[in-house]
Amino acid sequence: FDKAVNLIFDMHNEYGFKAMKETGQSNSTFVKGLKQLFGERVAIFSLDPQSTRARGVQPDHEVYISYDQVTVDDVATLQDELKLNPTAVESAYLVYAIYKDRWLLTLLAQEGPDVEEFAKEIGAHPGSLVALHRKLKRLENFPFMVQKGHADGDVVDRIMEYLDRGINVVLEFGQQTSMLCYLLVANIIS
């Protein structure tokens, strides 16, 4: 019976608790989600707990990702989405070589002309680092991004604990529907 578990990336909030029926009718009829159907065998993790609660659902876990969980390889896989040139990714590796897990926080903490000065200090091309900085600043708009780890611990570890216990996980994105958000979270979790 319980031979497999699922990790569902629910970008449109359709699988967790309930979803609007896909009929042409204007009435707001809902269909049950996995949590209503399978109860404790499903856990809802939310990147946007405010949105989840606004739909009348209490998430099992709120998802927070700290900047130190984002690797340069995660950014490299986002190269097309962020429209980064290869030298910008190389610049990220230069920042990482010096600052390790704090590379992203250190980079994003730079402001204005400080970014060019920072580039010179680490031996990166100033234009590349400025472009990388500008494009990665978008991550600061994601409410689930935090400077330090959250009290619940590492979200990847928490999801794996649930899956190991045979509990299916629905990861709701709430209002966070950009492709950048989806790809970033998928990279970090997988």
Over which residues does each language-model region extend?
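P-loop NTPase motor domains
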Residues: 2-8, 12-190
